[in-house]
UniProtKB/Swiss-Prot annotation:
Its EC number is 2.3.1.274. HAMAP family: PlsX. Catalyzes the reversible formation of acyl-phosphate (acyl-PO(4)) from acyl-[acyl-carrier-protein] (acyl-ACP). This enzyme utilizes acyl-ACP as fatty acyl donor, but not acyl-CoA. It is an enzyme of class 2 (transferase). InterPro entries: FA_synthesis (IPR003664), Phospholipid_synth_PlsX-like (IPR012281). The lineage of its organism: Bacteria, Pseudomonadati, Pseudomonadota, Alphaproteobacteria, Hyphomicrobiales. This is Phosphate acyltransferase. Keywords: Cytoplasm, Lipid biosynthesis, Lipid metabolism, Phospholipid biosynthesis, Phospholipid metabolism, Transferase. Belongs to the PlsX family. It is found in: Cytoplasm.
Amino acid sequence: MPVKVRIALDAMGGDFGPSVIVPGAAISLGRHPDAEFLLFGDSALIEKELAAHPALKKVSRVIHTDVAVSMHDKPSQALRRGRKVSSMWLAIEAVKKGEADVAVSAGNTGALMAMARFCLRTLPGIDRPAIAATWPTVRGDSVVLDLGATIGGDAAHLKALAVMGAAMASVLFDLERPTVGLLNIGVEEIKGGEEIREAAELLRAMQSPRFEFVGFVEGDGIGKGAADVIVSEGFSGNIALKAAEGTARQISEYLKAAMSRTWRSKIGYLFARDAFKALKDKMDPNKSNGGVFLGLNGIVVKSHGGTSADGFAYAVDVGYDMVRYDLLTKINQTLNREAGALVSTPTAQEAVS
């Protein structure tokens, strides 16, 4: 376990670049004073932001590059133009070289997945990585994957995702045997497409001592905490994520409008202010920011591109925690024990956004 957690940042990633990445790193440093940073990107822009954060500057090293991956680049374009030279690639490569323990980027999801896969390579039997994140529920938190790294996938792919997600939940939630469910349009065994029904059969047949398969989970079951791990292919998983984030913001706006409508509602808000603050904090999408790319020979964390400094700080926190929990080693151990789940998945395709 490293004395310091070394975090490589794609400082040019996301919608706002260093103006969000640097302050976000400073916020996270305040929570994790044993972290140090490598910031890749335009040194002039980065140094300008660092000037306002002397504590961060003291534990940071800036590596200049003029090349940044845009949010509109296709994965193939990003690899052709940015391999070896872009801020995104260099942050990932720092993990490969052992100069950093984790890379964090708010950049283009498809490009990040392609570069991470090309640079770090995937674990034996894993065709493409999956994005996994913690999801707040009424029972605590769940691990949900895949949130958009791949589109589609056969039953073996879903089975491998279940094994990786269960390993992550075991580490994060200190669970000996987490429950695992497959996201589906119904809980009945006859529901869903052929791939998901076959995946359910494979997971039941495993009878794994390391997780308990509980069957299918409908969309509303995610928020109910129906399982410790919810597994989906990336297309459906990403839609579920964006729908939940949009709903949270919508409810927040409804409450804000309702509480300011009349003088009675304003007085009522004053009495219930602490309860409303707790609700707002629970529903804040920023606090769930930071998806981990599982299935790689290294740790890469994806932040939302349009996040704020506070939101990016949470993504950095996720990267820090993954290193401190020694997640990669523990997931590898679990995958080696469940070697039958590690099969190639030729039907899974790259996400492009």
